Amino acid sequence: LLAFHGGDGDEGDFPQQDQFDALAGLEDFIVAYPIADSERTVAEGEWYLNSAATSREDNDYAEAIVDDLSKVYCIDDSRLYATGYSLGSMYTYEIACQLNHRFAAVASFAGSMPVEPETCNMQGRMAVMHIHGKLDYLIDYHNDWDWKDGEHEGVGTMSSVPGMIDFWAEKSNCQNSYSHYHLEVEHIVHNECNGDVRIEHYGMELHEHTWPEQVGGTYTYELIWEFLNHFSN
């Protein structure tokens, strides 16, 4: 499991990092916390978004981490996952689009992805879970929005969260969906999808941009791992 930090997040721990580490010990998986290139400009952002298939700097970095860890540990290559927070969440959708031949699933909080991604070809299969506060003041939940008012024009318009969930449901040709509310959280599930994946969303009615300790009564780190752990590629 690779956990990608948010903007300016390289200076501190990943949210619930101690809990992720403890869970990894119990569940026998490896979690790694990549640090972005500190020399990038504010307009570029710590993680490159909406990169074409020929622009693979961060993707190569993610794969290199997995390859290096595989030289030391016994890793099941069919069970590679990514999570992230904010900008790190946005980057997990680069992995979902461009590294789905290796990674099986992504689950993250408070990100989005471009409305028109440069490259998003399904060579493997990709399960997606996204958690988001509906009162998020940085990453708009309900509407498409322009990335930093044109500072990084290569990224383009970013998707609303409902639009992004629909994108992945269509990408995996999901044939069924259902939803329910619990503790001010809307839970949407798209299933009967290609490759037996699921596309899930937790919309937190009263939450903003900060990483939540719990989602609908379940610790966030546990919810993320419970989802990811269902899938292999």
What kind of region is each of these model predictions?
Residues 7, 36, 134-137, 144, ...:
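Acidic beta-to-alpha connecting loop that harbors the catalytic carboxylate
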Residues 134-198, 214-218:
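Active-site-adjacent alpha-helix of alpha/beta-hydrolase-fold enzymes
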Residues 217-233:
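Catalytic active-site module of serine/aspartate enzymes centered on a nucleophile-bearing elbow/loop
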Residues 130-132:
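Short beta-strand/loop motif that positions the catalytic acidic residue
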Residues 70-72, 77-126:
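Primarily recognizes the serine-hydrolase "nucleophile elbow" in alpha/beta-hydrolase
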Residues 122-128, 195-199:
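Short, proline-enriched alpha-helix->beta-strand connector loops that line the catalytic pocket
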Residues 2-4, 109, 204:
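Alpha/beta-hydrolase
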Residues 1-81, 91-94, 98, 213-218:
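Serine-hydrolase catalytic machinery in alpha/beta-hydrolase-like enzymes
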